[in-house]
């Protein structure tokens, strides 16, 4: 399963939900919406 908004993540292994337009922030290390 992919990671939802606000979940902690690893930028080098981005597991955030792409279908929800989420991406792992390299700065904050959590899933945020890509605009």
From Swiss-Prot:
InterPro entries: Huwentoxin-1, Huwentoxin_CS1. The presence of a 'disulfide through disulfide knot' structurally defines this protein as a knottin. This is Mu-theraphotoxin-Hd1a. GO terms for molecular function: ion channel inhibitor activity; sodium channel regulator activity; toxin activity. PROSITE patterns: HWTX_1. Keywords: Disulfide bond, Ion channel impairing toxin, Knottin, Neurotoxin, Secreted, Toxin, Voltage-gated sodium channel impairing toxin. Its main location: secreted. Disulfide bonds join 2-17, 9-24, 16-31. It is found in: Secreted. Gating-modifier toxin that reversibly and voltage-independently inhibits human Nav1.1/SCN1A and Nav1.7/SCN9A (IC(50)=111 nM). It also shows moderate inhibition on Nav1.2/SCN2A (1 uM inhibits current by 55%), Nav1.6/SCN8A (31%), Nav1.3/SCN5A (27%) and Nav1.4/SCN4A (23%). This toxin inhibits Nav1.7/SCN9A by interacting with the S3b-S4 paddle motif in channel domain II. GO terms for cellular component: extracellular region. Expressed by the venom gland. Belongs to the neurotoxin 10 (Hwtx-1) family. 22 (Htx-4) subfamily. The keyword Transcription regulation does not apply. Pfam families: Toxin_12 (PF07740). It comes from Cyriopagopus doriae (Tarantula spider). Negative results: does not inhibit Nav1.5/SCN5A, Nav1.8/SCN10A, and presumably not Nav1.9/SCN11A voltage-gated sodium channels.
């Amino acid at each position: 399963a992919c990671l939802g908004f606000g979940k902690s993540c690893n930028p080098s292994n981005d597991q955030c939900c792409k279908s929800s337009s989420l991406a792992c922030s390299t700065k904050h290390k959590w899933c945020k919406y890509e605009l």
